[in-house]
Amino acid sequence: MKQTLLVVALAAAASAGAAVTVQAEDGVDKAGATAFDIRMFAGPPGAKAYACFVRRYDANHLAQHPKQKVSAMKLLVTAEDAPEDKTTNYSFRLGVTYRHRSGNFDSSGFCNHAIATDSGHEIRFECGVDCEGGGISVALSKDDKSAIARLSSIRMWNRNKPDDDASEELIAGADDKIFRVDRADTRECAELVTDRKELAALRHK
């Protein structure tokens, strides 16, 4: 199921993926969602848009956060028109490497707009992995130059192993609950994409 993106309930994503208090999609007004999309994708999304965020944690940061398991993170957020449903679908792909083990680990799922009632009612994305795989919450910094990813647990897959052998959980510890990842050229996130047509489109953005 690694490469299959299935729509999941927002409530499940919020409770399993990110420890925040949210209101569901129908509590987000259209103007607010549109404004958030423009911030996220650095302009109106159009038919399809990407936002890439990357962080490689340096030795100084890791020394200050000795319990942090993640040494690097890439986050790709996608918006795509679905004309037949008269709506826009949002999805995410997440890639991490760990500081004390080798390999690249990925996850993916669908997102919805949500209102975080515990932080000034800001709009963010609540994103979930299918089959109760947890998820993440994605907000933006005030200057829109970074994304703030929050999690409590999310299912990850080793990119180079069969699905049955590759699944594991990234569980938020003392230093793995909140990650700031910085906006980057979309080509920085190309390794997260497996579809050839989509990869070509991403590289030409």
List the predicted regions and their residue ranges:
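Positively charged n-region of N-terminal signal peptides that target proteins for export
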Residues: 1-4
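Bacterial N-terminal signal peptides
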Residues: 7-16
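Amphipathic/hydrophobic helical signal segments and adjacent flexible N-terminal regions
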Residues: 18-70, 131-133, 142-205
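Disulfide-bonded cysteine motifs in exported proteins
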Residues: 47-48, 77, 106, 122, ...
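Short, hydrophobic/aromatic-rich segments at coil-to-beta transitions
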Residues: 47-54, 85-92, 121-125
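Generic structural hydrophobic/aromatic packing signal, biased to beta-strands
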Residues: 55, 73-75, 94, 138, ...
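N-terminal glycine/threonine-rich, aromatic-flanked beta-hairpin/loop signature
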Residues: 64-113, 188
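Surface-exposed, polar helix/loop patches in the mature regions of secreted/periplasmic/lumenal proteins
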Residues: 98-154
